Amino acid sequence: MAQETQTLNRSSDSSSLLSAHFALGWTLICVLVLLVYHRMLVELVWTWWSDPDVSHGFLVPIFAGYLVWVKRKSLPNKEVTITWSGVSVVALGLVLLFLGIYGVSVFLTRISFVVVLTGLTYCFGGWPLLKELRFALLVLVLAIPLPSIIFNEIAIPLQFFTSKLASHLLPLFGVPVFREGNMIELATVKLEVAEACSGIRSLVTLFTLAVFYGYFLEKSFLRRVVLALSSIPIAIAANAIRIFGTGLCVEYWDRDKALGFFHQFSGWVMFLVSLGCLFIVHRIMRLALVLWRRA
């Protein structure tokens, strides 16, 4: 009996020591983040607030925090080990931070935050903890705005594609158009598909929401990927229909209302329609799976 009591006490002491290591590790992580990245984090939040193209960034840390919260009960039960292999990941993150600061690359500085956080998680929690939190860490990348050079490589082709698609649809409804680049010339007005109307804002936001949606409502990794990728053509088509609708309103309704109220309001409407289309895609995938299993 006494021997069993000693065994239980040793087990309790070991568990307490592991919990202490766990708490110490994450305390150091928080302190390091605040010391090294506080300025970058403040600037990132300001970017989310001031730039409508990346305003979805506010949702990402909330989602990542929720993922950690959901797993909170299982995390302390994992075997906590200090894994020094994670130091190499931290070192990589610090190299990216150095290159970002002295190479004047805000993107590298922000990416380094995720890399360092991943490395520290590996250091103080080992593979078991990193395995549990890998998606929460990976999803943080969605909160980081793309570099301007990559952003423009996406936005500019979207502008031309959207204007081209809308200019093909309008004549089908009796609206004569002449398109030059991203300019759509109607009988009474020229419509410019500017960067803000390229659809990249709704594309990035819808893609982010598709990732969240897939994580919560799908267990299959492949179907999660399909859901996320399907958000891209959905967002592009929705934006083209929005421009097309604006052209119809200019021609058959009121120019000022079309370019003002309708153009703004239709953005919200088409985004809700896009969410509905995402849900339909998911239902079709599930139905196809059921039919395939029955066959």
Which residues does each predicted region cover?
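Hydrophobic N-terminal alpha-helices or hydrophobic patches in metabolic proteins across all domains
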Residues: 2-295
